[in-house]
Structures are given as structure tokens and as C-alpha cells.
Amino acid sequence: MGFLQLLVVAVLASEHRVAGAAEVFGNSSEGLIEFSVGKFRYFELNRPFPEEAILHDISSNVTFLIFQIHSQYQNTTVSFSPTLLSNSSETGTASGLVFILRPEQSTCTWYLGTSGIQPVQNMAILLSYSERDPVPGGCNLEFDLDIDPNIYLEYNFFETTIKFAPANLGYARGVDPPPCDAGTDQDSRWRLQYDVYQYFLPENDLTEEMLLKHLQRMVSVPQVKASALKVVTLTANDKTSVSFSSLPGQGVIYNVIVWDPFLNTSAAYIPAHTYACSFEAGEGSCASLGRVSSKVFFTLFALLGFFICFFGHRFWKTELFFIGFIIMGFFFYILITRLTPIKYDVNLILTAVTGSVGGMFLVAVWWRFGILSICMLCVGLVLGFLISSVTFFTPLGNLKIFHDDGVFWVTFSCIAILIPVVFMGCLRILNILTCGVIGSYSVVLAIDSYWSTSLSYITLNVLKRALNKDFHRAFTNVPFQTNDFIILAVWGMLAVSGITLQIRRERGRPFFPPHPYKLWKQERERRVTNILDPSYHIPPLRERLYGRLTQIKGLFQKEQPAGERTPLLL
């Protein structure tokens, strides 16, 4: 019995020790929060008074500490002193401080607070570093703190930009830090390199618990390297600023690891996160990103695209309207967005009207002139545009050479033009491929207006680049998760089904319909010359319309009274 009791006590003690190494909840005492190195702490901060935080028993081989605190969207403040000063405190959703330790120092204190009305749920952690590790933000000249390990994040509809202060070489306790601008040789901070990492949260999940859970993977060097995607490596000669394509409604965490190649040591900055939207905005908040106008527009567009996917080649004029709508609508949207400040909803309505005009114009060109090569050039360019967009949607689009606008647009145009050139000898196959691929992709765009998917950024990234002159510097990585694979499978299934069905149905049929205007002229001449044709005796359209109007008018006239009649003569 005694052995069993000892076994139970040992198991409980081990479980408590493992849990404590990962997370600690709550406060140890009123107004005082105790931390341990490397342990995550969850707690709430309230507005009235700042709370004091403390760390005991700091190891003698620790040279500096980095404290960081995270919340989802409400700001919190961390400060060296109870009085908040700009050069000794930091405020934000992801903020922190560097504590340079003095000789024999074994205790460290700081203060936490919030200016928000509502209580703020936070997660915080302390990380320790030795004298061989580089100091993140140790050569700060741009921001308020003397040593600033924070990553500053700005976003708009087009791009998200992160900025951070350069690091410095590590140094022992009680020793002056190495000068930041004394030289550019290998004995100075100019040998340091910066690896920028990007981590995507699960799609369509805006919960606070999910964010704080995944932030734990982005605080220390080994976890960042194992979990996140390395986007770019910067040297000390590069500008400490990196831009990414904004993904509204998609949670993204960014972090920077500074590496000393001479000592092979690293340190992590404080990760920053964003959803590229506001949780507190009334209109267009993170919880209601999909506009009604977008849903209506892309739903109608998808219905037409779905029809084109399976029946486009048979209904040739309808397909031409669809292609003309895409071409004219795309260029008009770019033009009106760049030249005018009108609202999105009005812009979308004008785009729909202009696209319809473009579609009818292409149909009219075919009906009157019947030049197949011009129509198929438009069809092939639309397919080439999508294939070129898919090409730059891959990691190829993030190559440094394509950050130059001239190189990008020339390469993009060459790929788009190459498609109709390659298929110019088999126009029917080109037309059916365009119907299947473009028609099915319109369904993907409609799905995105209701349920976010990364596949919409295939064309949206190109549109952003055409609209924004600074988008060329942005990295266009997107998450590719379970729902994206499902929608990709739907896209592929629709495209293959539509192409296969149309190829089988069009066997033995003429490649394309005859010239409509010639048929109309031949029919008109036949009716004029052939008096045996019953249609020859049909009155002209004007007389038929006049007769029909006369009949309708007679329905509203009163019947005249019958007058005196002459009797029959026997």
C-alpha cells in the first residue's frame, strides 16, 4: 500500500513539473506577477493600475533577457518603471524589452499595464541569452527604445510591411557594448545576418486561443526554424524592412532571427502578428470581410462561368460575351481605381456595366466581320493570363529578379502571348481548354467571396501589382491548407469534366459556327428572289409591328353602335 501511494505522488509531481515547464495560468499574488525563464504565462491585465512583474534567481551565465507580451488586438504596455516614458516603455499587441544585466544581478523587475477599458488576455514569456549571442535591436537609431527588439508592423489592402532595428554583437556583463558604426569589418555588427520568417495561422480561424497557441512556436530560435517559412535573408547592408502581400482575414506571424556567422549563435526578435484587418471597426471588420456587392457580382459571374465550362464551345456567342466581359472589366477596373477615388461598390457596378459592354462589343465584332483569328486571340490571351498568373503564384514569383516591374511585366506578357501562339494550329482545342479552365476558375472566385481561399490570390496578386506601384517589393506567399486543397480539387474536377464533355460532344461537328452576317445576307437574298418560299410572302418587319400595334389599339376602342340597316329585297 505504501509503495502505491509513493507511485501516485511521483506521477502527480512529474505531471505538475511538465505542465509548469510549458504554461502557467493566473497570478501568484495580487499586483505581482512572477515569471520563470522559458515558461509561458497567461494572465489578464486591467486598466486602473499597472502590475509589477519580477524574475528571481537569474543564472550568472545569462547576459541579457528579452521579455515579450502578446494579445490578440488590444494594446498592452511593458515598462522599466511605473512611470511610462517613451524611451523606457513599449505599447502594442506584441511588445517587449531587453534587460541588459549588471554584474552579480540575479533579480529583475518591470511593469505591465493596459489603457483599454476591457480586461486584456495576455501571454508572456522571458528568454535568456549569453554573451556570445547577438543582441536584437542593439543598434537602434530609428525607434524610441535604446535597445529595441520589437518588430513594427504596418498594413494596408495591398501590402504588409515589417520594420526592425539592427542588432549588435553580444558582450559580457559590465562591459560596454561594441560600437555600432565604428567599422564594417568582420569584427563589427556588419557581419550579422537576418533571417525573416513567416508563419500562417489556420485559415478562417480568428479566435484568440488559436493565436496564442501558435505564437508559442514563434518565440525561440529552434521553434521558429522548425515551424515557420524562411522568406528572405538580409545582410547588414540591406534595409531592415520587408514587405509582404496583405491577406485580409488571414492570421500571419512574422519574426526575425539574427545570426552571427562567426560564432554561429542566434537570437530571435519579438514576433509580430496581423490579420490585415481591424477587430474593432464597424464596417469591414475581420468578422465581416465579405461585401454583399462582391458576393452578388462573383455569384452571377460564376453562374455564367459554370455554363461556359460545360457548354461554351457550343454557345459560341455566349462565350465571346464572357471573354469580352473579362477583358474589358479587368482593364476598366484598373483604370478607374487608379484614376478616381470612388468607393468599391460603385466601382464594382461600373465594372459590371463596362464589362457587359465589352462582351457585347466582341459578339458584335464576330457577327459583323466574322474574323475568327481576332476572337481566338482574345480567348487565348485570357487563358494565357491565367496560366501566367499561376506561374507567378508559385515560389518563382518571389525571385529577386521579378521584384523589378519591367522584368515582371515583360515575362508575364510573354507567357500570356505564348499560349495563343502555341495553339494557333488547333483553335478548337484552345477554345475548349479556355472554356473549361476559365469557367471553372470563376467558380473558385465565387467560393472565395463566401469562404476564404488562397486560390483567389492567383489573379488578385496580379491585380494588386497593376494597381499599386509599391507592390513589386512584396513577397506573395500564401497559406495552402486543407480547404485550399479541397477547392483546388473542385477546380480541377470542373475543368477536366467540362473539357472532356465538350471534346466528346463536338466530335464530327464543324470546328466553329459560320459567319453570322454572311448567313443573314444569304437568307435575305434567298427570300427576295424565291417567290415560292413561304417566307417571301411575309410582310416586312415594320408592317408586321404596325399591324400588331393596331390590333392592340383596337382592344381599347369602344365598339361603334350599329346604325339603320336596309331590309333585304325579296
From Swiss-Prot:
Topological category with respect to the lipid bilayer: Multi-pass membrane protein
Annotated glycan sites: 27, 61, 75, 87, 264
InterPro entries referenced in this protein's UniProt entry, alphabetically: TM7S3/TM198-like_dom, TM7SF3
Protein location: Cell membrane
Top-level taxonomic group: Eukaryota
Organs and tissues of expression: Widely expressed. Highly expressed in kidney and pancreas.
The name this protein goes by in its record: Transmembrane 7 superfamily member 3
Gene that encodes it: TM7SF3
